[in-house]
Amino acid sequence: VGMIAMMSMRPGIAIPAFQEAERLLASECRGTEWERMMARHFACYAQVASGDLDAGRRGAAQHVDEARRHNDTFALGMFMTTPRAWHWILEDDPAKAGPDFDEALRGWPTDEYYMVHHFEALSRGTVSLYQQRNEEALGIFLTMGQKLRAAMLTSLQALFAEYLFWLSRAAIRAGDVATAKRAARSLRRIKLRICEGYLEGLRGLEANRRGDGAAAERHLARAMEMCDEADFPLYGVGYRYRLGQQLGGASGERLIHQARDWLTRQGAKNPDRVLDMMAPGFDGVASQRLLP
């Protein structure tokens, strides 16, 4: 149930399923340490995806300590990547993430592309984007794309969609409109609710670029709703922030405050920086379209 929900990008359903799986494996089965570790990892991963960032990072920290005690290279590699990366983003201390990523890859072959390599690259690119090292982040994600295709992992639509979200954000930040368009074109072919919500957000950002305030408000409001409905409030809160900026005045300030408050309650020390990363594009060139 948990994996079906994850592959459908419904983290709200996946979280309790993975937690129950871990409980059953611990109480009813023997010799299932690997399966329990994977259930724990995907529960933390789904918590981050769903926007329960603080729970995801606290769970990852606990499992990192356990992996170190047991000298578990596989578990350490998994937990030191995506769940752990968000700890340093929330702490607004991204420079400390690099040693974690290096530790995650220690002992793994360098000429293969396993899941730990995927999660490490995704995490490293996300942290670079948070640091506003936009071209560096874009380079990481473009290299990831080549490896995903070589490993034939693009057929896993949830994994590929998440990659495309981050590729798109990095391309927008770096001013690579052609890559942003290619990412949007690929997302259109993935029929998942969160993909539709993300694309609706791009329509809002594009409308803002061309000065069409009414369209920007309409698309951003719809994107916010669609992302929340898809169990991705972390994406929705970015569009809430941008909608507030678009509206201005007292109503806009209220939305901006709500977005900041939501992230602050998740432990974010610099919520505006997270929000700008999640929904970039308001400072783009009006003549350049984001969508194909």
Identify the role of each PLM range.
Residues 18, 33, 43:
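Active-site/ligand-binding-proximal alpha/beta "capping" segment
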Residues 36-38:
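Aromatic- and glycine-enriched pocket-lining scaffold segments that form the walls
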Residues 1-25:
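Active-site cavity-forming subdomains of large catalytic enzyme subunits
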Residues 19-22, 45-292:
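Helix-coil-helix junctions within alpha-helical repeat/solenoid scaffolds
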